[in-house]
């Protein structure tokens, strides 16, 4: 099954983008080649761009505190696995403490680093980080991989509490949903939501069908339409019945 996820609001959309960026960052940071570390560094700049939103930190803290208050009353409940509950609450409380310790504007340490700022300004120009443009950056790229890795890890460190918070919120959202098997008749599916509020929709489709879901929703109804990509042409709507799994997630 291939999993597709669709956010229902801007906050979840931002967290999904952050998750994708941090996963890409971790992958390229673990590599050895300077060109791969260049991708890790430019991804760090993208992360700083997304996390630089003034209200992101406060939004995450409010959501984590809300989840803590929701889960804490279940302590001592015999119907709840207490070890798992304590692990989640401990993770939330530690992440809240780490967020509270973040001082100043998010990502300001990258702005204040003149050398990184010069790389960042050139990185948005196609081919702008050639060795003749940034000889000091080229020299740094010749350092041992582990030394480069340590530098990049140091630069990402102040942003990690936001990664941890986003991870918790997305995990709790995903775990809140229950998958149901449904059928898109002639490639199209609709479902009434009756005014219920959801944050995230997951669509799982059989890999062998080679179909691509396109989704939209409002507070009353959701639509899923399946298309198929064939060569260089735009995806076209399919007219076959498509079985898939639908999960609606609500924090």
Swiss-Prot record:
GO cellular component terms, semicolon-separated: cell division site; cytoplasm
User: Where found in the cell?
Assistant: Cytoplasm
Instruction: Quote the SUPFAM superfamilies the UniProt record gives.
Output: YacF-like
**What are the alphabetically sorted keywords of the record?**
Cell cycle, Cell division, Cytoplasm, Septation
Homology family: Belongs to the ZapD family.
Q: Which HAMAP family does its entry note?
A: ZapD (MF_01092)
NCBIfam families hit by this protein: PRK05287.1-4
Q: What is this protein called?
A: Cell division protein ZapD
Q: What organism is the protein native to?
A: Burkholderia multivorans (strain ATCC 17616 / 249)
Q: Could you tell me the gene encoding this protein?
A: zapD
């Amino acid at each position: 099954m291939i999993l597709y996820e669709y956010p229902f609001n801007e906050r979840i959309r931002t967290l999904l983008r952050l998750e994708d960026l941090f996963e890409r960052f971790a992958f390229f940071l673990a590599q050895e080649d300077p060109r791969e570390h260049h991708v890790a560094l430019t991804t760090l700049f993208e992360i700083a761009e997304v996390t630089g939103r003034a209200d992101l930190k406060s939004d995450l803290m409010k959501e984590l505190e809300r989840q803590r208050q929701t889960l804490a009353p279940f302590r001592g409940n015999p119907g709840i696995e207490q070890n798992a509950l304590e692990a989640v609450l401990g993770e939330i409380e530690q992440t809240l403490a780490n967020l509270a310790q973040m001082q100043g504007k998010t990502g300001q340490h990258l702005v204040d680093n003149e050398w990184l700022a010069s790389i960042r300004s050139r990185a948005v120009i196609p081919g702008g980080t050639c060795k003749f443009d940034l000889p000091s950056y080229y020299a740094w790229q010749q350092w041992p991989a582990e030394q480069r890795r340590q530098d990049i890890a140091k630069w990402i460190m102040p942003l990690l509490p936001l990664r941890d918070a986003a991870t918790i919120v997305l995990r709790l959202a995903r775990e809140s949903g229950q998958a149901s098997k449904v059928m898109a008749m002639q490639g199209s599916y609709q479902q009434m939501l009756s005014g219920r509020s959801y944050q995230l929709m997951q669509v799982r489709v059989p890999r062998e069908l080679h179909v691509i879901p396109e989704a939209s929703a409002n507070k009353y109804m959701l639509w899923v339409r399946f298309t198929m990509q064939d060569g260089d042409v735009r995806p076209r709507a399919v007219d076959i019945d498509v079985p898939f799994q639908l999960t609606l997630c609500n924090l």
